[in-house]
């Protein structure tokens, strides 16, 4: 009866500390060598049942100071209750292990909630504006569509934002670099100037309404020189070489036509001479082939035997003149 009263008072003293201490003491209680009596075992099992204890409510965002300092009293309480339950043989290392299992840090719930609340109030990340990409019509994180840039002929954008103008030469189809520009319109004007120099009025221009005067382009904005002087000089040299090759092609074609015209009168004169000779002589001139075939025809040289004449056999013909090693002619003729 006294043991039961001691266990009851011990259980009342442990209710304030919670059920975590008893969960940590369960494996050590089972390994105790001294087995208690039946009455003390029944009371101990009733004492260790988890329904006999009620966990204190965990503090919210602002924990109480008494709750934080409460686990430090478990070491002194453990030595007092060890004699009641039968844990006198626990070593100091085991006691420290139990204390380390009990002293868990509190979950930082208020810190996480504050972080989530600050994430809701923080601005959304936005991508940088990409003006050269035609497909990026919408910016990331914004519902307002961005204005797509116009694409020009012979113009492309570098990945760092600059614009480059290039043109293909009509002869060998190679690309000629025209320069790097800050805007797409400047690069398009440079392409128009180069295309007009190479192809003239047949060029396809980005701005066909502008007028081209030498190396300048005129419009409502005034006179503008889009190409660099070195690029302009290179274009002039290319245009001169193209003009020279065109002149050479035209000269070769005209010379071929003249050769055809010179050769055609000679043939006509030969035909006319032959016609005149036929009309004067009355008969065409005899060729060498006709002269060779006129003397004798190939049919006159052929001779055929008369089928009515009997064949002439030689009666003195004997087979002995033609001996053979396989046939015995003496036995045959005997």
UniProtKB/Swiss-Prot annotation:
Keyword flag Transcription: yes
Biological process, per Gene Ontology: cellular response to salt stress; cytokinin-activated signaling pathway; ethylene-activated signaling pathway; regulation of cell differentiation; response to cold; response to heat; response to light stimulus; response to osmotic stress
Coiled coil (UniProt feature): none
GO molecular function per UniProt: DNA binding; DNA-binding transcription factor activity; sequence-specific DNA binding; transcription cis-regulatory region binding
Compositional bias segments (type: Basic and acidic residues): 261-275
Family of the protein in this entry: Belongs to the AP2/ERF transcription factor family. ERF subfamily.
GO CC term (a single one): nucleus
Annotated region described as Disordered, given as residue ranges: 243-317
Subcellular location: Nucleus
Name of this protein: Ethylene-responsive transcription factor RAP2-4
Classification via CDD domains: AP2
The entry's DNA-binding region: 151-208
PANTHER family for the chain: ETHYLENE-RESPONSIVE TRANSCRIPTION FACTOR ERF061, ETHYLENE-RESPONSIVE TRANSCRIPTION FACTOR RAP2-4
Biological classification of the source: Eukaryota, Viridiplantae, Streptophyta, Embryophyta, Tracheophyta
């Amino acid at each position: 009866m006294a043991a039961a009263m001691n266990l009851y008072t011990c259980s009342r003293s442990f209710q304030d500390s919670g059920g975590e201490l008893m969960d940590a003491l369960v494996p050590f209680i089972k390994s105790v060598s001294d087995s208690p009596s039946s009455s003390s075992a029944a009371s101990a099992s009733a004492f260790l049942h988890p329904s006999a204890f009620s966990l204190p409510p965990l503090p919210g965002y602002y924990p109480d100071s008494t709750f934080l300092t409460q686990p430090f009293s478990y070491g002194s309480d453990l030595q007092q209750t060890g004699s009641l339950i039968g844990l006198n043989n626990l070593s100091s290392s085991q006691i420290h292990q139990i204390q380390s299992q009990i002293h868990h840090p509190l979950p930082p719930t208020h810190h996480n909630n504050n972080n989530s609340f600050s994430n809701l109030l923080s601005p959304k990340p936005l991508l940088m504006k990409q003006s050269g990409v035609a497909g990026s019509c919408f910016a990331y994180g914004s519902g307002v569509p961005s204005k797509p840039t116009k694409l020009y002929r012979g113009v492309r954008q570098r990945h760092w934002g600059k614009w480059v103008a290039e043109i293909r030469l009509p002869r060998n189809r190679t690309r000629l670099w025209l320069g790097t520009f800050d805007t797409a319109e400047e690069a398009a004007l440079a392409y128009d100037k180069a295309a007009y120099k190479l192809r003239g009025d047949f060029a396809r221009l980005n701005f066909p309404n502008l007028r081209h005067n030498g190396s300048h382009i005129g419009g409502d904005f005034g006179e503008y020189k889009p190409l660099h002087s070195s690029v302009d000089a290179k274009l002039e040299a290319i245009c001169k070489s193209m003009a020279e090759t065109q002149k050479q092609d035209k000269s070769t074609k005209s010379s071929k036509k003249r050769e055809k015209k010179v050769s055609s009168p000679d043939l006509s004169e030969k035909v006319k001479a032959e016609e005149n000779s036929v009309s004067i002589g009355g008969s065409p001139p005899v060729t060498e082939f006709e002269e060779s075939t006129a003397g004798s025809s190939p049919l006159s040289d052929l001779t055929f035997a008369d089928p009515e004449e009997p064949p002439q056999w030689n009666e003195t013909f004997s087979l002995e003149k033609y001996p053979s090693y396989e046939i015995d002619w003496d036995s045959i003729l005997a």
